[in-house]
């Protein structure tokens, strides 16, 4: 290889998802969003855009920065329910919470109807299994455009 020749894959990078409320420069590990495999991630349109459970977290956390950067306004929202509390390292910033999906959609300024549809379709497609958040398990969805 000659000096200055391109190397690697320019479409790939090691980039983690961080809380958008973190400091502009280097929020550090305390701003990394680790809840991704325990819920869903939606874009500004309220739609999922990748399989959140493709692999268990220690192997896949570094792809989410790139995936979110490819979304409109480079924003994604990791959404979990109360069952996920305590199963991941929270960011230093408190989570946004709501008793309703509509209320959450208003807080994050995305279309409530789209978010509700995404969550309803996801929940309806869920196939129960033996849950283990530390390894690939047999919990999944079936019949979605992007299955988990």
What name fits each language-model region?
Residues 1-148:
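Residues forming the flavin
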């Amino acid at each position: 290889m000659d000096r200055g020749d391109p190397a690697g894959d320019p479409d790939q990078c090691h980039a983690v998802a961080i809380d958008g409320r973190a400091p502009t420069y280097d929020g550090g590990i305390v701003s990394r969003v680790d809840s991704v495999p325990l819920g869903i991630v939606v874009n500004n349109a309220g739609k999922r855009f990748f399989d959140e459970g493709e692999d268990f977290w220690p192997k896949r956390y570094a792809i989410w920065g790139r995936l979110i950067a490819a979304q409109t306004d480079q924003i994604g929202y990791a959404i979990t329910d109360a069952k996920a509390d305590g199963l991941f390292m929270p960011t230093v910033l408190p989570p946004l919470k709501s008793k309703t999906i509509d209320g959450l959609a208003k807080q994050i300024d995305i279309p409530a109807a789209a978010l509700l549809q995404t969550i309803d379709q996801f929940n309806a497609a869920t196939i129960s299994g033996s849950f283990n958040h530390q390894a690939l398990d047999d919990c999944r969805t079936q019949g979605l455009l992007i299955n988990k």
